[in-house]
Amino acid sequence: MATTDEIIGKTAPSRLVDHNLVDREVESLCGGMVRYEKRPAKRRDGSTAEGLFNAWIVLNNPKQYNSYTTDMIKALILAFRRASVDREVNAVVFTGTGDKAFCTGGNTKEYAEYYAGNPQEYRQYMRLFNDMVSSILGCDKPVICRVNGMRIGGGQEIGMACDFTIAQDLANFGQAGPKHGSAAIGGATDFLPVMIGCEQAMVSGTLCEPFSAHKAARLGIVSGLVPALKIGGSFVANPTVITDRMLDEYGRGVHGDFRTGAAYKEGLAAIKGGEVDLSLLDAAVEELCAKLLETFPECMTKSLEELRKPKLSAWNANKENSRAWLALNMMNEARAGFRAFNEGTKETGREIDFVKLRQGLARGIPWSEQLIDGLIAALLARRSER
C-alpha cells in the first residue's frame, strides 16, 4: 500500500488556482503598519509540520497604541482574506506590536482631523470597518486574538470577533463609546450580550469602565490567561488586581476586580519595577495552534461557521443601520468627543464637561460648531486651572 506522502505526490494537481482577490502585499497598503507573516506550524511535541503555517496578522502602530487607520483597515481585510484562502495556513494569530496594546480602536487623530463633521466620508469609512469585522467572522481558519496589551474600544470589538482570546494578565479590556462621543455599535453591542449576558453587556457598553484580563476571563471573554510580569526572575499575577480570593466579606464576587487605594498604588509600583515578559503568552498561543492543527480541516471550518452564528447573526442584522447612525453622529457628539480626545492631554483630561453639555441640551440649545468649540476651549482651559 502506498504511503500518504506517495499518494500526495501522485494526486496533487500540478497547478493550483489563486483565489486571492488582488496580488498585492498586505504591508504595501499601509506602509508596514499591518504585518502579515507565515510562521511554521508546530505539533504539540514542538516539531515543525513541514509545509504548514500559522498566519500572524500584526497591528504595527505602537506609537498610537496600535489604533487602526483607514489604510490599516484595508490591509486587515486583505490579510484575513489571504489567510482564509491559503491552503497552507492552519490558524490565524491576530495581535499587536509591543506589550502595551493589542488595539485601542480607531485612530482618533484621523477621526478628529478628517472625519469629524464629514458624515458622508465616515459612512464610507464604516463600510471598510464593517468589511474588516466581517472578514474576521468569515475567515475559513480559526482566529486567535493574542492580547499582548490593552484591548479597548474598537480594539475590543475586533478582538471579540475572533474565535479565541489568549491574554497576558496586565492587559485591560473595555469600551469607550459614550465617554468619547460614540456608541459601541461596531460589534460590541452585538457580541457582548451573546458572550457575557445582557446585564454585564449593559455595564460595559454604557459605563465604559476598563476591566482586567482576570475579570475578562471570569466573564467568559478570554479562554486563556497567562502572567506577564516578572519580579525577581519569577512570574507573578497582575499586582493591581485581586487574584487571591473569590469573595469579599459580604459574599460579593471580587476576583479580577482592580485593587483600590494604597494597594492599587503598590501594584503599579511593582509593575514599574518589574519586567514584562510575553514568553508564556507565545507558548500558550503555540499550544492552541498545535491543538487546532490536529483536527480535520473541513470539519474545523464547519464547526467555526456554526459556532460563530450567534455573533454573526446579530452583527449582520445591525451593521448597516449602525453605519448610517455613526456617520450622522459625526456632526455632533462624535465631533466633540473625538476632538476632545485628540486635543486633550494628560493634564487636561480627554473628556468634555458632560454636565455642562447636558444642562445646555436640557434648555434646547442646538448643536453647532460654536458649541463644540466652546466645549473644547473649556477642556483645554483646565490646563491652567491645574
Where does each model-flagged region fall?
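A structural preference for short, pocket-lining loop segments at secondary-structure junctions
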Residues: 50-60, 74-117, 134-147, 164, ...
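Crotonase-fold acyl-CoA enzyme core
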Residues: 135-154, 158-297
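Hydrophobic alpha-helical membrane-association signature
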Residues: 72-76, 125-128, 281
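Hydrophobic alpha-helical segments typical of transmembrane helices
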Residues: 128, 132, 188-191, 200, ...
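Short amphipathic alpha-helices within nucleic acid-binding modules
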Residues: 65-68
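C-terminal alpha-helix plus adjacent terminal tail
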Residues: 1-53, 87, 99, 212-214, ...
